[in-house]
């Protein structure tokens, strides 16, 4: 079993008529993702790559029975798109958009929680259950079906580690890019809990980075897990006070250093790799 999304997931693409929306819709369709609808206000009644376009998510749910959404909408309008999906009854919302204002992120975070939906992102590469479905912008050719779950704050590091696992013959059950902003819809612990309960997943890779306390909080949960966890923390040489790529990747007041996160993960029983290749090798040792 995959977590969050699988071959039964019916997807609506919000922003399907834009360049990014159309480009990634084609890639997702080629992978086998069941894209049943697109949404762009004012473009209802048209088609993109054979996918019917509606004016609203509510209409897409009613007409095409969509139950998941992937959002390619510019930052000023992305929060409204997320909240529209939640209000329409969509249960899995993947927001790729970067640069959403913090107050907008807070509003959409709580609206999604109130609706009982799952939000992946924002500012994330999406989610893939290899061989089943893909919602997002990941390079699908590097993944293969298997029993290693990956949860990550970093897109490119996810790709590196997944590629290395695949090279070693280790496939993935589901790969979740939770996003690099300070406010995200789904955190490490929520995904770790799903992997812990998933019969198909035999080991988990956690990819963290400097900033915040998410990895330390995850370490507390890892203590209680029955499945082995291998970690990687980016930013070992990052200078304090300087944002390193993601809005959440900043060390402030001595909190959020790579050293503190590595120490917490190791104390919880996780093994921590120094390089993406070493992470894959540690997983191979365990399995």
From Swiss-Prot:
Q: Name one GO cellular component term.
A: succinate-CoA ligase complex (ADP-forming)
Catalyzed reaction equations? succinate + ATP + CoA = succinyl-CoA + ADP + phosphate; GTP + succinate + CoA = succinyl-CoA + GDP + phosphate
The Swiss-Prot or TrEMBL record annotates one GO molecular function as:
succinate-CoA ligase (GDP-forming) activity
Q: Which keywords does this chain's UniProt record carry?
A: Ligase, Nucleotide-binding, Tricarboxylic acid cycle
- Positions annotated to bind substrate: 159
- Which one GO biological process term can you cite for this protein? tricarboxylic acid cycle
Pfam families, alphabetized: CoA_binding, Ligase_CoA
EC category name = ligase
**SMART domains to which the protein is assigned, alphabetical:** CoA_binding
Q: Which InterPro entries match?
A: Cit_synth/succinyl-CoA_lig_AS, Citrt_syn/SCS-alpha_CS, CoA-bd, CoA_lig_alpha, NAD(P)-bd_dom_sf, SUCC_ACL_C, Succinyl-CoA_synth-like
Residues at the catalytic site: 246
| Purpose of the protein | Succinyl-CoA synthetase functions in the citric acid cycle (TCA), coupling the hydrolysis of succinyl-CoA to the synthesis of either ATP or GTP and thus represents the only step of substrate-level phosphorylation in the TCA. The alpha subunit of the enzyme binds the substrates coenzyme A and phosphate, while succinate binding and nucleotide specificity is provided by the beta subunit.
Q: Which PANTHER family does the record cross-reference, listed alphabetically?
A: SUCCINATE--COA LIGASE [ADP_GDP-FORMING] SUBUNIT ALPHA, MITOCHONDRIAL, SUCCINYL-COA LIGASE SUBUNIT ALPHA
Q: HAMAP family from the entry? A: Succ_CoA_alpha (MF_01988)
How the protein assembles, per its UniProt entry?
A: Heterotetramer of two alpha and two beta subunits.
Homology family: Belongs to the succinate/malate CoA ligase alpha subunit family.
Q: What is this protein called?
A: Succinate--CoA ligase [ADP-forming] subunit alpha 2
